[in-house]
């Protein structure tokens, strides 16, 4: 059985989070957590929590063996954008877009 975990509204841009997600896509759950644990990127900490939550969901809800789990899919979608203004020279202003992400992780048995 597949188990899912979703983090909505993570305050990181999807472009930055997708770089980390691509590193662990398709790996076993244990090796993915180890890679994310030693990564220095902010997205790695967020994705590690979601992967660990999906592993816990698989164990508690479906009784899956943790050692046999693999990351089937990991998707990073765009979330809500916060629009802010920054003061510039000569009375002007420019727009700042603070992006957020929705991170979805699906783990299942390795085939």
UniProtKB/Swiss-Prot annotation:
Any one annotated GO CC term: cytosolic large ribosomal subunit
Any coiled-coil regions, as ranges: none
Keyword Ribonucleoprotein set for record: yes
Cystine crosslinks: none
UniProt record, GO biological process: translation
Keywords, sorted A to Z: Ribonucleoprotein, Ribosomal protein, RNA-binding, rRNA-binding
Annotated InterPro entries: Ribosomal_uL22 (IPR001063), Ribosomal_uL22_bac/chlpt-type (IPR005727), Ribosomal_uL22_bac/org-type (IPR047867), Ribosomal_uL22_CS (IPR018260), Ribosomal_uL22_sf (IPR036394)
One GO MF term: structural constituent of ribosome
Domain of life: Bacteria
Subunit structure: Part of the 50S ribosomal subunit.
HAMAP family: Ribosomal_uL22_B
Similarity comment text for this entry: Belongs to the universal ribosomal protein uL22 family.
Function recorded in the entry: This protein binds specifically to 23S rRNA; its binding is stimulated by other ribosomal proteins, e.g. L4, L17, and L20. It is important during the early stages of 50S assembly. It makes multiple contacts with different domains of the 23S rRNA in the assembled 50S subunit and ribosome. The globular domain of the protein is located near the polypeptide exit tunnel on the outside of the subunit, while an extended beta-hairpin is found that lines the wall of the exit tunnel in the center of the 70S ribosome.
Matching PANTHER family: CHLOROPLAST 50S RIBOSOMAL PROTEIN L22-RELATED, LARGE RIBOSOMAL SUBUNIT PROTEIN UL22M
Protein name as catalogued: Large ribosomal subunit protein uL22
Species in which this protein is naturally found: Xylella fastidiosa (strain 9a5c)
Gene: rplV
């Amino acid at each position: 059985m597949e188990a899912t975990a979703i983090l909505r509204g993570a305050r990181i841009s999807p472009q930055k989070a997708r770089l980390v997600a691509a590193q662990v896509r398709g790996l076993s759950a244990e090796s993915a957590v180890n890679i994310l644990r030693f990564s220095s990127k902010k997205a790695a900490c967020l994705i590690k929590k979601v992967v660990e939550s999906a592993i816990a969901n698989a164990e508690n809800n479906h009784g899956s063996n943790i050692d046999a789990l693999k990351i089937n899919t990991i998707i990073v979608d765009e979330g809500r954008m916060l629009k802010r203004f920054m003061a510039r020279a000569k009375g002007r202003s420019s727009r700042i877009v603070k992006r957020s992400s929705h991170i979805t992780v699906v783990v299942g048995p390795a085939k």
